[in-house]
Amino acid sequence: MEKEVIAYLDNETIIDSQSVKNTNLKEIYFDNSKESLEVIRHSCAHLMAQAIKSLYPEAKFFVGPVIEDGFYYDFRVESKIGEEDLVKIEKKMKELAEAKIEISKYEITKSEALAKFQNDDLKQEVLLRIPDRAVSIYKQGEFEDLCRGPHVPNTKFLRFFKLTRVAGAYLGGDEKREMLTRIYGTAFADKESLKEYLTIIEEAKKRDHRKLGTELKLFTFDDEIGGGLPIWLSNGARLRSKLEHMLYKIHRLRGYEPVRGPELLKADAWKISGHYANYKENMYFTQIDEQEYGIKPMNCVGHIKIYQSDVRSYRDLPLKFFEYGVVHRHEKSGVLHGLFRVREFTQDDAHIFCMPSQIKEQVLEILAFVDNLMKLFDFSYEMEISTKPEKAIGDDEIWEIATKALKEALDEQGLKYGIDEGGGAFYGPKIDIKITDALKRKWQCGTIQVDFNLPSRFKLEYTDSDNEKKQPVMLHRAILGSFERFIGILTEHCAGEFPFFIAPTAVGIVPIGEAHIAYAKEIQKELLELNIDSEVYEKNESLSKKIRIAEKQKLPMILVLGDDEVAKRSVALRDRRAKEQKNLSLDEFIKLVKEKMSEVHF
């Protein structure tokens, strides 16, 4: 069957099929392409709003955008809407889709729109955010709403959708304002794609790091402590410590010097850096001796001061500083989400001070670091370069050198990458590292950011080979992004089945009876000498219960010890990752775990 056209593409702008006069534009067909899904999902948000309005006539609507994997709509109703109401709303949506209602667009002036929606305070809110120009309105049957579009031409295209959850959302994201109802949903062009997506969603629920974090006793949150402030339990702290120690060694082998900056800096430093003017609302401030101080949201200023603590020559460059820097950022309570979005987190942060001619060499080193680390955890990844925006500092030549260095480094490594033209920060181009997990979800983690701005603001300099003062380039670099976020992603990626070398408890030791506990503790001590954590299950419980408890903790290996094992100094091994059981001498087992630990190569 021939595909139907639902919209057109004008450069990067998607236009409704009913608005197009120039038929030379690229056609967008009804399929699962990125552009098509944007149109389908945008339209489906309106279909949902129309259904809600039909079921709850008093409903008033705020905004309903497309997001990465679907859409949502924020609205106000007198009734409390819960998960159980989604089925009823979906049923009404299907009726409207099957009615094949035409969708049309018309434009009015902003003043006309203000008059039209004078009795709708949420629409007034939306209009206040729109510039003084023509306002577009989309109409389908009795329902119409402000929207810039684009939309499909008829509701018949909106058949494969699912409403996924209900949440609360502050009006305009401002937690001081009223809480609206938000319903999330998704839509596709065919039934199979929707089914596949819903299967992934169900699997994601099982892997939710907040759920697993509780079950595996990794971390917790407490209202008396505050939102977005994770508390690491012993299992989580062990996992995190293993990751930190592993990365520390790798950093040293790659020529990075450990440093540490203060967590509290005078506001004057943040004024020089530009954070005070441009990032203040995301920072926490306090007064000490009648002077304002800011808790650091980033580690760069501390590292700059370390650079400035000595006279620098071109022979010293590149200088590579790294720190597990604890930072604090003011996040609105509505966006906090487990370990993914917190107010306190630790970055695996590094700053490299180098000459422009050294940028490519340094980026190559970072890319090799990224590749080794992602392979270790079985992540695939992709890169994206963001180039010079319209408003930028630094001369064109430096920008060209830096951008070329990033591209050449990626090309030399044979890495595919996208380009976000004009998407760079005003102070330099960057590479974003996006990893793909076991559920094919993409996560923004690491960044390689070239910075001409801070070296200029703080007047950094080095003496070149001609004995002249020059300004170094600064590279901001984080590979994990933050330990919190990465551990959250890793937990979901491996469903809590952590690799042996990083598992908080790598071995569960199950003595059958009291007579076998001493041997179990001997093995535990020997493992600890190898930096391998284990747990002895010595409670007076049945063997099957002890094994079941160990399995629920998703331990990589379980040892069962009885009379035979004690007498022969052996172990009955259950390797949960290899899915095998076997008997080994204690020496053979120790050799095996040493091999497991040596699998970490950099």
Curated annotation (Swiss-Prot):
GO terms of molecular function: ATP binding; metal ion binding; threonine-tRNA ligase activity; tRNA binding
EC number annotated for this UniProt entry: 6.1.1.3
One GO cellular component term: cytosol
Broad enzyme group: ligase
Keywords of this entry: Aminoacyl-tRNA synthetase, ATP-binding, Cytoplasm, Ligase, Metal-binding, Nucleotide-binding, Protein biosynthesis, RNA-binding, tRNA-binding, Zinc
Cofactors: Zn(2+)
Compartment annotation: Cytoplasm
Pfam family, one: HGTP_anticodon
Listed InterPro entries: aa-tRNA-synt_IIb, aa-tRNA-synth_II, aa-tRNA-synth_II/BPL/LPL, Anticodon-bd, Anticodon-bd_dom_sf, Thr-tRNA-ligase_IIa, Thr/Ala-tRNA-synth_IIc_edit, ThrRS_anticodon
Main location class: cytoplasm
Any single biological process term in GO: threonyl-tRNA aminoacylation
Residues that hold Zn(2+) according to the record: 300, 351, 476
Superkingdom assignment: Bacteria
Subunit-structure text: Homodimer.
Family (UniProt): Belongs to the class-II aminoacyl-tRNA synthetase family.
Alphabetized PANTHER family for the sequence: THREONINE--TRNA LIGASE, CHLOROPLASTIC_MITOCHONDRIAL 2 (PTHR11451:SF44), THREONINE-TRNA LIGASE (PTHR11451)
Cited function: Catalyzes the attachment of threonine to tRNA(Thr) in a two-step reaction: L-threonine is first activated by ATP to form Thr-AMP and then transferred to the acceptor end of tRNA(Thr). Also edits incorrectly charged L-seryl-tRNA(Thr).
NCBIfam families in the cross-refs: thrS (TIGR00418)
Name of this protein: Threonine--tRNA ligase
Organism this protein belongs to: Campylobacter jejuni subsp. jejuni serotype O:2 (strain ATCC 700819 / NCTC 11168)
